[in-house]
Amino acid sequence: MTEFIPPGTRFHALPSPFPFKRGGALHGARVAYETWGTLAADASNAILIVTGLSPDAHAAANDANPAAGWWEGMVGPGKAIDTDRWFVVCVNSLGSCKGSTGPASLNPATGQPYRLDFPELSIEDGARAAIEVVRALGIEQLACVVGNSMGGMTALAVLMLHPGIARSHVNISGSAQALPFSIAIRSLQREAIRLDPRWNGGHYDDDAYPESGMRMARKLGVITYRSALEWDGRFGRVRLDSDQTDDDPFGLEFQVESYLEGHARRFVRFFDPNCYLYLSRSMDWFDLAEYADGDVLAGLAKIRVEKALAIGANTDILFPVQQQQQVADGLRAGGADAHFIGLESPQGHDAFLVDFDRFGPAVRGFLDAL
């Protein structure tokens, strides 16, 4: 079992024990993070970024690691999240394999990876861990907490669990609860991993690794991260050249199939399967309605921020834009100056990672007005 930690990653030790929402606790756990910009003397210019399922804390290039980050087009000097003005902190989610303690990490009690002995992970656990980093940096109140995809859930949990922790919020392609379609897709992804004989109840290693299950899980994910409009525009029904196919009568024939296969193969050895299972399930469990007798809008209305922006792509099938509209409506009911923007992007759920021409101005306009 392997962790994948970028150069320049910083670490914060969590309190020991660190209890989990659903029971159990970690001892000697840590959270991975990176920072950009300069914290103001009064610590009033801090922005927290909480991520989706797979990213590490390296959102953009910095002095510690000049390699491009996963949100390079959004974070940096003069960009939408302008590090000339803002002190930006990006936290890798608890439960990940990218630096924060997760199922692939060594259990100090045994000297072996936690595997399935890791406590049941909730979005709220990741939110509490992120705020431990914020407090350690001397920040009492954030100017803004920004979350995308799963990070949109984590950001809402941060705001719910820590009233007054942030003056504003940007929710990008996120939600206040998981929809049945998303739960169904993620359940199939987890099943694909667990049905791979090499998963072996979570006891795999680099030599006996559930690559087939991970590859199928990733393919299912990529299909939901994009849109039919993008598939049509990029691939249509174009077939592979004869020298790109093999003799398997049911093998790869169309370019879109080849794309999925290549994308999945690039991913499977760079993310731990057990971490994938834990983080995926934490998204299914998250529901702000739990905080308001089953009413998600009432749950959102309990959050207190001055301003909020919820944005998404109209082609997103995994976190559809009505969920971002719901976030804006609920926060507005709680007294926030909250707005929703649905963007006409062809790139589906992953649009926030690539469509900076649309997402960038929306985020920049909101932050510039703070």
UniProtKB/Swiss-Prot annotation:
GO molecular function: homoserine O-acetyltransferase activity; L-serine O-succinyltransferase activity
Cellular compartment(s): Cytoplasm
Pathways per UniProt: Amino-acid biosynthesis; L-cysteine biosynthesis; L-cysteine from L-serine: step 1/2
Provenance organism: Stenotrophomonas maltophilia (strain K279a)
Chain positions covered by the region annotation Important for substrate specificity: 52-55
Gene, per the UniProt record: metX
Matching InterPro entries: AB_hydrolase_1 (IPR000073), AB_hydrolase_fold (IPR029058), HAT_MetX-like (IPR008220)
Lineage: Bacteria, Pseudomonadati, Pseudomonadota, Gammaproteobacteria, Lysobacterales
Family according to the record: Belongs to the AB hydrolase superfamily. MetX family.
Marked site: Important for acyl-CoA specificity: 186
Tagged with keyword Amino-acid biosynthesis: yes
Binding site for substrate: 218, 350
EC number: 2.3.1.-
Protein name, per record: Serine O-succinyltransferase
